[in-house]
Amino acid sequence: MKNFRVTNRNKIVKLFLGSFQFSVVIVLLATLMTTMTSAQVNIKVGGGLGVMTPASDLGGSTMEYYNGTNYGLSGGLNIHAKAKIGLVGFNLTGEIDYSSLSNSGNSEPGQGAVDISQKILSLKIGPEFRLSMPVVPIVPYLGINLALNSFSGETTFQGVSKVPSATYSVNSATRLGIGFAAGAEVSIGPLLSLDFNLSYNLMNVSGKEWNDVNPGINQRIDSYLSLNDASDPLYNFDDDKHFVSKARSIQSVLFTVSVLFGL
């Protein structure tokens, strides 16, 4: 019980520190950018749909997920809301993304059924630097953002040899990340535009950790009950209960189309 309280206290402290760091950066960035110019700003808000494709260790197969090498997810849909504050030469952009990823397959060749689902909620803020194209109603841009990413989901094992058959919830986890974007905003009216955006997202740059939700019990299933993007501190080559040997990088490619309304 003592270890459980300490573990949860550490999780709360880490989450608070991560959220505090993110908030400080947002405030400083917003203050800096709004004081860089005294020109009148323009504001656009809207939202849209997109497609997220896993990259690095976020993708792979269900067998790789079962073996602890990556998360075994395939592509999924994204919905989002976006706001832009237009300043001289750049936009200050904020975005809320919700993406749903999943995959199904075997735990071993021809054996065991595994269904994985992952939900990712991301809060992003950063500048977009506009590239001038006179006369043409298209404004290309390059952007960078700081992101606070929240992960949750569930996994179902059926007929898997080393894990009891059941559906398991995955503990939510929060990580800080960075994204790089390129896009174009196409004007289709005085106060209406379409925003096409392609971004590459490093989603767990900061905050990787290993969380054993049942520290008093030595069982394989615990490795799947949290995000566990750090290596298992109890990893042993011959131990089938502690098999995650290295930290895992969570990255993605996201393509979105947004409808923006000028205010």
Regions found by a protein language model. Give the residues of each.
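Predominantly the C-terminal beta-signal and adjacent terminal strand-loop region
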Residues: G189-L263
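Gram-negative (and chloroplast) outer-membrane scaffold detector with strong preference
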Residues: K82-V163, N171, S252-L263
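Membrane-spanning beta-strand positions in outer-membrane beta-barrel proteins
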Residues: N42-K44, G89-N91, P137-V139, G179, ...
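Bacterial N-terminal signal peptides
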Residues: S19-T35
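Transmembrane beta-barrel strands of outer-membrane/channel proteins
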Residues: V45-T53, L92-Y98, L142-L148, A184, ...
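Short glycine/proline- and aromatic-enriched beta-strand/turn motifs that initiate or cap beta-hairpins
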Residues: A39-G86, A247-L263
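Gram-negative outer-membrane beta-barrel proteins
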Residues: V51-S61, S100-E108, L148-T156, L202-W210
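Extracellular loop and loop/strand-boundary signature of outer-membrane beta-barrel proteins
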Residues: G59-T69, S107-S117, K162-V170, K241-S245
